[in-house]
């Protein structure tokens, strides 16, 4: 997205340029990430968390010295280093949200964004029914059994991690265009926690996560968030909203992992 905005690409040209360039970079980074996870098996949760936290300072250095010439992206004083937030409205901000909008009174339904979301989910569901998708699921359930069947487990793990990284790269572009702002530096620091909370509350586990888990979890999480924050503002001081959001997000993750461990112990007995 940085290079798209720097080149001043607008509308769909900027959006697709950002998506395809991001996916190309994600191919390489996903491969390197897969090598790390394959080398450190059974510690994926810890390794994934700290790998993400470690990569943010690396990107902060890039943002500071990035060869960008678009003055709207740079600090006004000195002209060196990207701003923490870059406005996408003059470029491709909400280009997907405005596609085929449906207006019902004051309610605006972003039909284009919803179709893109459900279309992506449908393609992932179709992929899960293919041979490769079934092998992915089998590896998550019982890696030793799949290896005994003569399947290259590390190869399929690498492919799955690369695919997830590529999809995430496209997802960040969709999220940013919908939000209208590109967040840099420490902006992505806590970005993964709401997503993890949503899919966990939707019924996902470390062994299995489906498109339905993501859909149900997003609805439940957003409903919980929307209902709890106004109550917190009414009962407490308004400044507590962000604190309550963090408590709710972290609490959902902790709750899910506690019951996941209980289920695993019950299966063992």
For the regions a language model picked out, list residue spans one by one.
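Membrane-interface helix caps of multi-pass small-molecule transporters
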Residues: 31, 35-40, 62-65, 125-126, ...
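Helix-loop-helix "hairpin" substructures at the membrane interface of multi-pass membrane proteins
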Residues: 103-183
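Transmembrane alpha-helical segments in multi-pass inner-membrane proteins
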Residues: 20-22, 168, 178-246
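Cytosolic-side transmembrane-helix boundaries in multi-pass membrane proteins
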Residues: 141-155, 226-269
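Alpha-helical transmembrane segments within multi-pass membrane transporters and channels
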Residues: 10-54, 221
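Transmembrane helix-bundle core of multi-pass membrane transporters
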Residues: 55-128, 236-241, 269
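Hydrophobic core segments of alpha-helical transmembrane domains in multi-pass membrane transport
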Residues: 53-60, 113-124, 164-172, 198-202, ...
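Membrane-water interface segments at the C-terminal ends of transmembrane alpha-helices
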Residues: 4-8, 42-71, 256
């Amino acid at each position: 997205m940085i290079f798209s905005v720097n080149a001043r690409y607008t509308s769909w040209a900027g959006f697709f340029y950002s998506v395809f360039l991001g996916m190309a970079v994600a191919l390489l980074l996903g491969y390197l990430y897969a090598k790390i996870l394959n080398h450190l098996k059974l510690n994926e949760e810890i390794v994934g968390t700290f790998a993400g936290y470690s990569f943010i300072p690396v990107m902060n250095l890039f943002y500071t010295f990035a060869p960008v010439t678009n003055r709207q992206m740079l600090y006004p004083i000195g002209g060196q280093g990207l701003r923490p937030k870059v406005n996408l409205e003059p470029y491709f901000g909400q280009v997907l949200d405005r596609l085929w909008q449906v207006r019902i009174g004051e309610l605006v339904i972003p039909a284009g964004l919803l179709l893109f979301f459900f279309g992506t989910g449908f393609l992932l569901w179709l992929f899960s029914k293919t041979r490769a998708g079934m092998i992915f699921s089998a590896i998550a359930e019982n890696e030793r059994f799949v290896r005994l069947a003569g399947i290259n487990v590390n190869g399929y793990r690498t492919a799955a991690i690369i695919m997830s990284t590529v999809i995430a790269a496209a997802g960040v572009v969709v999220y940013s265009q919908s939000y209208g702002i590109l967040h840099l530096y420490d902006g992505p620091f806590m970005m993964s926690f709401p997503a993890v909370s949503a899919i966990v509350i939707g019924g996902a586990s470390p062994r299995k996560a489906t498109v339905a888990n993501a859909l149900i979890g997003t609805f439940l999480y957003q409903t919980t968030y929307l209902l709890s924050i106004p109550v917190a503002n009414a009962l407490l001081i308004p400044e507590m909203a962000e604190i309550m959001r963090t408590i709710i997000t972290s609490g959902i993750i902790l709750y899910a992992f506690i019951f996941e461990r209980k289920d695993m112990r019950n299966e063992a007995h």
